[in-house]
């Protein structure tokens, strides 16, 4: 991509969503920080990311539009009610989900969750009808689903997410560590926090991943939710890597410190706060926000739009990468196959980037060791782009 400097004045409609009018001096497109042109940016919208699903190579287009969000909870009528204090029909979230699955049908089931802390593992199985899980309390921090599990947790005697079944592995593993997992399609959530409370270092291992939420079913909408962890906080990907699933996060909060939004799924983060925390790794640590493992034939991985990237825990300026490619299943560069191995895809546009973001090189080498490269590359060119971003970390 040639180096260009553009003056932008836009008031665009992307996927039916009105963006704020802005006047901005666009960052110069460089080999290490490629910027989309005005023309190219038209291909990377909410509508384009959410348009298709199914088998990679033969995707089905249904032009799904999730931008209306979950809806106002005041208009919901709960089919099932949960309260940790015992004041409702069910004391656990999982018990209510199990009841909804047992009742079956195709109509959407509404599960209200009273403000409180729910220390449990949650599974929404593939067999579940459409479910809306919500709290009437608009502060997502007041209704928390939390569990303590991690990749290195010894499997013997430990509970793992019930969506995953049994395993002969010695440790729980990354995906099995999820506090909440959604395998059904058409899942909605609002006003909730999903958290993994694992304290890194409790069990020795180089991989300290601990998932708070795993979305594995298609057409998930999550609005005003918080997803909190450290390494590998939010996982997005189908149970079969030949399939594409879609998730839409609206006005939500995601926090972590290493590869904390990862997977092969297609997801949009619209009006979200994506927060890097330096509390565990230290102020000067170098880390990564996104770690997509997008299939090479899938043009859409992760899109962050109208969002805010900030930091907490005294993170140093110019310390955090926006992301790196997760070359899932690839042990090293000698095993990487161009056009066949995963090649993560991310676009960050119309967003505010904090001073913690690295200016000259916001995209790091892949997990298999591929050096970041945007053109004329020995390996597949990275698919990471920006457009019309602002803030100290944007390069503007």
Curated annotation (Swiss-Prot):
The keyword Isomerase does not apply. Involved in maceration and soft-rotting of plant tissue. The keyword Secreted applies. It comes from the Bacteria. It is found in: Secreted. Pfam families: Pectinesterase. The lineage of its organism: Bacteria, Pseudomonadati, Pseudomonadota, Betaproteobacteria, Burkholderiales. GO terms for molecular function: pectinesterase activity. Keywords: Aspartyl esterase, Cell wall biogenesis/degradation, Hydrolase, Secreted, Signal. Pathway: Glycan metabolism; pectin degradation; 2-dehydro-3-deoxy-D-gluconate from pectin: step 1/5. Substrate binds at residues 174, 324, 326. Belongs to the pectinesterase family. This is Pectinesterase. PANTHER family: ACYL-COA THIOESTER HYDROLASE YBHC-RELATED (PTHR31321), PECTINESTERASE 53-RELATED (PTHR31321:SF57). Its EC number is 3.1.1.11. It comes from Ralstonia solanacearum (Pseudomonas solanacearum). The record marks 231 as: Transition state stabilizer. The active site is at 232 (proton donor), 259 (nucleophile). The gene is pme. One of its GO terms (biological process) is pectin catabolic process. Residues 1-26 form the signal peptide. It catalyses: [(1->4)-alpha-D-galacturonosyl methyl ester](n) + n H2O = [(1->4)-alpha-D-galacturonosyl](n) + n methanol + n H(+). Its main location: secreted. NCBIfam families: PRK10531.1.
């Amino acid at each position: 991509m040639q180096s260009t400097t553009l003056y932008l004045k836009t008031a665009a409609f992307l996927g039916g969503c009105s963006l704020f009018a802005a006047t901005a001096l666009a960052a110069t497109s460089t080999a290490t920080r490629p910027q989309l042109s005005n023309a190219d940016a038209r291909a990377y919208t909410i509508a384009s990311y959410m348009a298709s699903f199914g088998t990679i190579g033969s995707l089905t287009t249904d032009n799904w539009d999730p931008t209306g969000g979950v809806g106002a909870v005041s208009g919901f009528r709960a089919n099932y009610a949960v309260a940790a204090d015992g004041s409702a029909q069910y004391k656990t979230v999982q018990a209510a989900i199990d009841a909804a699955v047992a009742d079956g049908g195709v109509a959407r089931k509404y599960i209200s969750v009273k403000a409180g802390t729910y220390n449990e593992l949650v599974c929404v199985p593939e067999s579940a009808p459409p479910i809306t899980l919500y709290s009437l309390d608009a502060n997502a921090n007041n209704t928390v689903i939390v569990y303590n599990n991690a990749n290195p947790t010894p499997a013997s005697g430990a509970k793992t997410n019930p969506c995953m079944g049994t395993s002969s592995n010695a440790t729980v593993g990354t995906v099995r560590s999820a506090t909440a997992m959604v395998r059904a399609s058409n899942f909605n959530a609002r006003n909730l926090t999903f958290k993994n409370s694992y304290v890194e270092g409790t069990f020795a291992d180089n991989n300290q991943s601990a998932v708070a939420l795993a979305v594995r079913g298609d057409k998930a909408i999550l609005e005003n939710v918080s997803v909190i962890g450290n390494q590998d906080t939010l996982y997005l990907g189908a149970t079969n890597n030949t399939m594409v699933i879609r998730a839409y996060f609206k006005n939500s909060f995601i926090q972590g410190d290493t590869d904390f939004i990862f997977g092969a799924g297609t997801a949009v983060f619209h009006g979200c706060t994506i927060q890097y925390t330096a509390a565990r790794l230290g102020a000067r640590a170098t880390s990564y926000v996104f770690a997509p493992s997008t299939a090479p034939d899938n043009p859409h991985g992760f899109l962050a739009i109208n969002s805010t990237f900030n930091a907490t825990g005294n993170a140093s300026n110019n310390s955090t990468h926006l992301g790196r490619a997760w070359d899932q299943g690839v042990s090293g560069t000698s095993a990487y196959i161009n056009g066949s191995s995963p090649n993560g895809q991310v676009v960050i546009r119309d967003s505010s980037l904090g001073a913690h973001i690295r200016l000259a090189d916001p995209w790091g080498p892949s997990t298999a060791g591929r050096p970041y490269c945007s053109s004329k590359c020995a390996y597949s060119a990275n698919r990471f782009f920006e457009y019309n971003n602002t803030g100290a970390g944007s390069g503007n």
